[in-house]
């Protein structure tokens, strides 16, 4: 994949996406499948296409993505972050527009760990007065 490919790494929750973009006709391949086959939800497809539509490059690039970890929403967010970074690698003048839309910043929210003595991260056992 060396040559005229631009690269970006995206992360969201526990998902990590490695994104490669090059000039093409708009094909997006995720883990060897077309994007419509890989992501079942329409919202996930919208999330992934956000940086491309914002910069008017929806049909300009062929994109290959390798994504591991997490669930569908986390993977979609990781792919979006990776595409954003790859676009900045391709053309640094796109960064202000992408930053203004909040796509450059990594969403740092992670699942909070379960605490000892509680049922979940913050949910305590039911209190019985008698």
Swiss-Prot record:
Coiled coil: none annotated. One of its GO terms (molecular function) is structural constituent of ribosome. InterPro entries: Ribosomal_Su5_D2-typ_SF, Ribosomal_uS9, Ribosomal_uS9_bac/plastid, Ribosomal_uS9_CS, Ribsml_uS5_D2-typ_fold_subgr. Keywords: Ribonucleoprotein, Ribosomal protein. One of its GO terms (biological process) is translation. GO terms for cellular component: cytosolic small ribosomal subunit. Pfam families: Ribosomal_S9 (PF00380). NCBIfam families: PRK00132.1. Belongs to the universal ribosomal protein uS9 family. PANTHER family: RIBOSOMAL PROTEIN S9, SMALL RIBOSOMAL SUBUNIT PROTEIN US9M. This is Small ribosomal subunit protein uS9. It comes from Ralstonia pickettii (strain 12J). The gene is rpsI.
